[in-house]
């Protein structure tokens, strides 16, 4: 007989460890499509002392089955080169509400952004979370109502679903 652990304590410890193993091995990892999916969270306007918004924060949820969302700073060769369609992996299109409805306004530089690699330590693993991107607004817009369309690309160039914000009124 072991003088530090009586037999009954060893059996209880062994049964506890086996029980913990069984319970944790039964937990299923969430499975998502390898094509990224996004869902709206919110759009927040930030005003300074003037009557028009100076910044907006676009926030949305995302999920991806193989976790390949994000670009490294060195990802600048094709297909991620500046002249290509995949330089920005968060694509944001800007629309102004004009007399005849919404019209897209192409900006230079665009509101689009490069999301950094989100899952560097666990490549190939399911990932989900939310992204918030701060956008600098025109302090003297020609039209006071706008909206955005946005989507993301993963590293495999899979395009997520496209979302549209509700009308955003820039004036207080």
Residue ranges of model-derived segments:
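C-terminal motif of bacterial Sec signal peptides marking the signal peptidase cleavage site
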Residues: 22-25
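Bacterial N-terminal signal peptides that target proteins for export
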Residues: 2-12
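Bacterial signal peptide processing site
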Residues: 27-30
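First exposed extracellular module after export/assembly in secreted or surface-exposed proteins
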Residues: 36-172
């Amino acid at each position: 007989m072991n003088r530090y652990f009586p037999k009954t304590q060893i059996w209880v410890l062994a049964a506890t460890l086996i029980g913990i193993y069984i319970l944790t091995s039964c937990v299923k990892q969430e499975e998502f499509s390898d094509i990224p999916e996004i869902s709206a969270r919110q759009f927040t306007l930030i005003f300074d002392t003037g009557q028009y918004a100076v910044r907006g924060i676009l926030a949305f949820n995302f999920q991806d089955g193989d976790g390949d969302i994000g670009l490294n700073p060195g990802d600048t060769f094709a297909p991620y080169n500046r002249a290509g369609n995949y330089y920005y992996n968060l694509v944001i299109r800007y629309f102004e509400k004009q007399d005849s409805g919404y019209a897209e306004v192409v900006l230079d530089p665009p509101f689009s952004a490069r999301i950094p690699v989100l899952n560097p330590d666990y490549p190939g693993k399911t990932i989900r979370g939310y992204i918030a991107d701060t956008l600098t607004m025109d302090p003297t817009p020609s039209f006071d109502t706008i909206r955005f369309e946005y989507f993301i690309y993963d590293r495999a160039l899979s395009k997520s679903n496209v979302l549209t914000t509700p009308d955003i009124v820039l004036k207080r």
